[in-house]
Amino acid sequence: MLERRQGSGTYVLSLGGGSAIADYFAAANNRDLIELRQTLEVTAAGLAAQRRDEDDIEQLRALLVRRNELWAPRHVEPHNVEEAISTDIAVHRAVVAASHNALYLELYDSLLGLMDHYMRGNPIGAECSFEHEHTRLVESVIAGDIGGATSATERLFTELGLSRDQPGRNFPHHPHD
């Protein structure tokens, strides 16, 4: 479930599944998730740079500012972890939403629970914030720079060290086991 906050953006409140595709994705491993995200987000970023509107721009700016604030401390305070994760996911989702491709957004939304789980298994804080990469991505989309948006997204995944050769790690929830 998402909540839209005026002047602040859209936040992920709950990560309900309920669809067959969500069950299938729940059995995926991290490598599979990252490969799908990278493919989807790079293309969506280019489309977002072409198609974003004023509402998208306003939301992207607000989410980026809040995301970078939350991720700035060396170690995110425990009471801010939920918001730090949901705001990071919301930035990426807002880029996909700005592509104005309903199927991309539907597919992306089906991945939200996995993304949340993945992020909880990794460090959160300034040393792993990738603020520059997130900022470059959002600024490129806002500027309408298609090449900049796609390369910023590729760079973000490269900086995260999430190459296609990274060994997969299964998520603990397997609904069909």
Residue ranges and their predicted role:
Residues 36, 40, 56-59, 83, ...:
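Residue-level detector of well-ordered alpha-helical segments, enriched
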Residues 95:
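Short basic (Lys/Arg) and small-residue
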Residues 65-68, 83-87, 109-177:
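C-terminal all-alpha effector/ligand-binding and dimerization domain
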Residues 56-74:
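Amphipathic alpha-helical segments enriched in hydrophobic/aromatic residues interleaved with Lys/Arg
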Residues 1-46, 50, 169-177:
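Short linear motifs at protein or domain termini
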